[in-house]
Amino acid sequence: MLGVLLVLHGSKIPEWKDVGIKYAEYLSRYFNLVEFGFLEFNKPTLSEALSNLLAKGANKIVVVPLLFATGTHFKRDIPRLLGIDGDEKKIQYMGKEIEIIIADPLGFDEKIGEVLVKGVNETYNKNY
């Protein structure tokens, strides 16, 4: 069964968790098993979110970093926190081999650009 694991950076500001909840709820319309975890500061941690997916029966997991670009968190921290060693994309869980596929960061997308334009316009219109 496919599991989707959203990865958020995290923040000392508790409202960050609301973003994870909203994205997980949205993706739950399309996928049965969706969890989110934070790289730092907030709960659930990435490891806790992974454990939740495994406990629910996920045997293939697509990890979706909600990050704009490739950096240290993407290249080093996410694989380490998931227990992935080197180029190996599998982990062991209760005697089973679990495949983990890490999606690319968001990068540039015109749809995200449209959201940014909307945000600029709304902010400007509220203030002028």
UniProtKB/Swiss-Prot annotation:
Q: Which UniProt keywords apply?
A: Cobalamin biosynthesis, Cobalt, Lyase, Metal-binding
Q: What is its EC number?
A: 4.99.1.3
Where does the secretion signal sit in this chain? none
SUPFAM superfamilies membership: Chelatase (SSF53800)
The pathway to which it is assigned is:
Cofactor biosynthesis; adenosylcobalamin biosynthesis; cob(II)yrinate a,c-diamide from sirohydrochlorin (anaerobic route): step 1/10
Name a biological process GO annotation: anaerobic cobalamin biosynthetic process
**Catalytic residues as annotated in Swiss-Prot or TrEMBL:** 9
Instruction: Please report which protein family the annotation says this sequence is part of.
Output: Belongs to the CbiX family. CbiXS subfamily.
HAMAP family according to UniProt: CbiX
Q: How does it assemble?
A: Homotetramer; dimer of dimers.
Q: State what protein this is by name.
A: Sirohydrochlorin cobaltochelatase
List the source organism. Answer: Saccharolobus islandicus (strain Y.G.57.14 / Yellowstone #1)
